C-alpha cells in the first residue's frame, strides 16, 4: 500500500528491525513516524589508492562527496548503489566486486544506511557521463586531499564520517 501515489521514484519503508513493512513513500515525502528508509553510498578507489570524489551540483549543496542515494522500491542496497553510480557517473559496476563495509541505523533521521567499497583500475574521468542535476565534476583525490577539503569545510560531513569508517575497514581487511 502506497502512502503517496504521485511520485515516480518510490522507496520501501522498513520497521526498526529493518524488516520491510510492505509500504512505500515517494521521493521527498516525509518518512512516517516509526518507519525507516535505506540510504546507500560507495567509495570507489583506483589502483593508485585515490578515491573518485564528486563535486555535487549547486542545488545539492556544491560540496565534495562520494556517490550515494536511495534504492528505489524493490531494490536491495547493493542494487541501489549500482544504479546510483550508473545514473550519476555513467559507470557500470561489476556487482561481484561491490563490497559492503559499514552500515547502521540513524533513529533521528529515520534511515538505515549501507556503505560500499569498489576497487577499479584507473578510469579516464572524461569517459564518465555525469548527471548534471546531481554532479558538477569528478576527480581522483588522495586521503590527504580529502582531509584538506574536510578541514576547509568543503567535504560533505556525513560522507566524511563514512570515509573514516572505510579507512578503518581497509586497514583491518588489508584490501
Per-range role (PLM):
Residues 12-13, 43, 103, 117:
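Residue-level detector of beta-strand face positions
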Residues 27-31, 101-106:
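Short, solvent-exposed loop/turn elements at beta->coil junctions and helix N-caps
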Residues 1-41, 47:
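Acidic, metal-coordinating catalytic segment for phosphate/diphosphate chemistry
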Residues 39-70:
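A glycine-rich, hydrophobic loop/mini-helix early in the fold
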Residues 53, 66-100:
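The catalytic Nudix box helix
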Residues 61-64, 102, 107-115, 120-175:
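Nudix hydrolase/Nudix homology domain
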Amino acid at each position: 500500500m502506497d502512502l503517496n501515489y504521485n511520485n515516480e521514484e518510490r522507496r520501501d519503508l522498513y520497521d526498526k528491525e529493518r524488516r520491510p513493512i510492505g509500504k512505500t513513500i515517494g521521493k521527498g515525502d516525509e518518512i512516517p513516524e516509526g518507519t525507516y528508509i535505506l540510504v546507500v553510498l560507495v567509495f570507489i578507489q583506483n589502483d593508485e589508492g585515490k578515491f573518485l570524489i564528486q563535486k555535487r551540483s549547486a542545488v545539492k549543496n556544491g560540496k565534495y562527496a562520494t556517490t550515494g542515494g536511495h534504492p528505489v522500491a524493490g531494490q536491495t542496497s547493493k542494487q541501489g548503489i549500482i544504479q546510483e553510480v550508473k545514473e550519476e557517473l555513467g559507470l557500470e559496476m561489476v556487482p561481484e566486486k561491490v563490497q559492503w563495509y559499514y552500515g547502521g541505523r540513524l533513529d533521528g533521521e529515520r534511515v538505515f544506511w549501507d556503505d560500499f567499497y569498489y576497487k577499479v583500475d584507473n578510469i579516464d574521468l572524461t569517459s564518465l557521463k555525469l548527471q548534471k542535476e546531481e554532479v558538477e565534476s569528478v576527480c581522483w583525490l588522495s586521503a590527504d586531499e580529502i582531509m584538506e577539503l574536510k578541514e576547509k569545510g568543503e567535504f560533505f560531513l556525513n560522507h566524511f564520517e563514512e570515509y573514516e569508517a572505510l579507512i578503518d575497514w581497509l586497514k583491518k581487511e588489508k584490501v
